[in-house]
UniProtKB/Swiss-Prot annotation:
Enzyme Commission identifier(s): 7.1.2.2
Name of this protein: ATP synthase subunit alpha, chloroplastic
Subunit structure: F-type ATPases have 2 components, CF(1) - the catalytic core - and CF(0) - the membrane proton channel. CF(1) has five subunits: alpha(3), beta(3), gamma(1), delta(1), epsilon(1). CF(0) has four main subunits: a, b, b' and c.
The gene coding this protein: atpA
Topological relation to the membrane, as annotated: Peripheral membrane protein
Recorded GO MF terms: ADP binding; ATP binding; proton-transporting ATP synthase activity, rotational mechanism
Species whose genome carries this gene: Mesostigma viride
Keywords: ATP synthesis, ATP-binding, CF(1), Chloroplast, Hydrogen ion transport, Ion transport, Membrane, Nucleotide-binding, Plastid, Thylakoid, Translocase, Transport
Task of the protein: Produces ATP from ADP in the presence of a proton gradient across the membrane. The alpha chain is a regulatory subunit.
Amino acid sequence: MIKIQPEEISSVIRKQIEQYNQEVKVVNTGTVLQVGDGIARIYGLAKAMAGELLEFEDGTVGIALNLESNNVGAVLMGDGFSIQEGSRVKATGKIAQIPIGESYIGRVVDALARPIDGKGDIPSSETRLIESPAPGIISRRSVYEPLQTGLVSVDAMIPIGRGQRELIIGDRQTGKTAVAIDTILNQKGQNVICVYVAIGQKASSVAQVVSTLEENGAMAYTIIVAENANAPATLQYLAPYTGATLAEFFMYSGRHTLVIYDDLSKQAQAYREMSLLLRRPPGREAYPGDVFYLHSRLLERAAKLSNALGEGSMTALPIIETQAGDVAAYIPTNVISITDGQIFLSADLFNSGIRPAINVGISVSRVGSAAQIKAMKQVAGKLKLELAQFAELEAFAQFASDLDKATQNQLARGRRLRELLKQAQSSPLPVAQQVLTIYAGVNGYLDSIAIEDVKKFLAGLRNYVITSKAAIINNINSSKAVTPETEGMMKEAINEYKKVFAAGA
């Protein structure tokens, strides 16, 4: 029989007492009362914060949105099929944040910045809150630099500046995404980081956008955030904030960024779904009362930063889909009032072959000519006036039988100017070529060209100037203005090419 040594036992006990750790880890936990439709009701969690991340037993993460007297309503960032009534929930003490960094450029990620393009993990050492506060008044300066879209009708008449919020609004299938993608393509070589956020889109549509950007070499400066139509409402609601957060990283490091939200109507619908399931009181069109705040806090994050903060910028192009052209519906009017102007795309113009189908009459930029180079200001003012007069005359001419010669000439020029604004998809024009094109139109050089030949003539003219008269393009690019010398060279080049075109025709 083994003899027990009391000294040994006492030394073991003493050692264990010395090593005993008195620290107590307090964890805020709760119990699932009810789960379904992407919503969980939790008993307990008395100290939960609004917007705090919650961790369920199966690893699913949720966000505490409703803090009620006897339970917490949380939205799930996953399907939550393996969460059961009575399972434990742990409050993490954290607010939703995502990793950020340079390595995200060229990648496709989801609303939690996790890669979904099959190209492996994204290395990152920094994180940023998804819901970051917008820059204050002192942190900003007024918009003064142009952000060229490459579309003649936008850059000439509805100019967008770096740091502006310009809404793209129109019915389905009117080319809203095409305008946004062309703007991304036109940022090549401009040192602008683009973020395209796809909310509730078909996976095939997102794949098409990715392939268009890859074919044109635009993925080298673009990040895509995608939450498809089959994603939980919570992730569709978060996706735009994730896009803004990724762009903010570059903005605060003194870079220029462009963010496209395609589209915010679907984000509002996802938020409505979440709110109704959380039993929040419905308002107009069954949207919750804070749906305006949903969009305003997102779009206010777009800014042109002050010199002290490095003069970075975030330009936002939110997209809104209307039903049968109704811009007076709830969400469209909300976003129109938040943004600095809107580009209105018309189904009638689209169907009549005018593409991009931009209705110049009701589209507006509230930044205006501050976001244009001098050369564009010199030629674009006349273009807008001529088109406005043409629209008025065209409506009148439908009822008048005999028109005088001056009116006929004005109508003929208006039709040619309308032709000048047509552009093929994925073929944005550099600003110097736009100036040349508009100059030819407003100064009557197209009046003798048949309407059906205008596009062919302008394409040939641009090609002729690039190959034979490159000094014109170089002068406009360097001086950002049409000097008398450049104007003389433009007149000469247009007249020379007209002879070449007439001989070829």
